[in-house]
Amino acid sequence: IFFNFMDNMNRYFLLFIISFFFFFFYNNNSEIEISTETQTLGLSQRSLVHDGIRRTYILYVPESYNEGAQLPLMINFHGFGLSAAVHMNEADMRPLAESENFILVYPQGAQSGDGFPHWNPDPIGGNNKSDIDDIGFVEVIIDSLEEELNIDPSRVYASGYSNGGYLIYGLACRLSNKIAAVGSVAGTMLGSTQNNCAASAPVGVINIHGTADYDVPYNGTTGLKSAADVVNFWSDLNQSEIEEISENNGFNQYDYNDLNGDTYVRHFKIINGGHTWDDNIRYGGKSSSQIIWEFVSLFNLSG
């Protein structure tokens, strides 16, 4: 009986130590669920609690992953009212993750007061859909995955569609110490995101926008910057104001280079293009996903 008692005491003591450890290290705004199972390749559904709200995301780890080699991380955000799963199927970067060897995440936006999933790109702006902290949520995703997987912390990228495109500009402004480059499709900047931008380092930016986009107008509208405004803002911030234009069948490509000839900002103006992440329409023989990856993957936090 005595030894059974001591065994129980040892187990309780061990549980206490483990509980204390996690309380000490994770007792902040975010509670991360740690799985005791070995990470499997392919798709998995993840969740965490940030700011008292349970948040979820889809993780895709390519078959090429092994713990001995660092891989880049790409985070891809859905549009307003959509879901991570739907967006993953419509803007599917999984084949690219396999061929180009990167880890892929599709986060799920929280519901606004009217019940629609959304993203808040500016934590202090008045044009957000709610007061939910999406910048902090993304930061926790990055930090937790860097702890779990062998991710190259200098090669973290973000891409987004529509409202998800709004968010990636907010991330570039707020997390330029973590995110090296971003890509937007049919998205833009809120006026408040631009006014409150606090980027502390250059960030590569690629923007794909259709001239017939009536949801997020190419020429802007009240509270939303035009495609030209967005491009000019980031070319100024990145000190890459030397413009090169190439006209193609159905789209024009604008590159903005620094004095060394490095392109920090690229804009695809899709003639008569609508409000869509359309990988069925090929721009110069490449999909939107390919165009974004080929651009952002050139960058790391050193430039």
Regions found by a protein language model. Name each.
Residues 75-79, 186, 209-210, 271:
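The conserved beta1-alpha1 loop
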Residues 214-226:
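Conserved alpha/beta-hydrolase "acid-adjacent" motif
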Residues 108-133:
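Cap/lid segment of the alpha/beta-hydrolase catalytic domain
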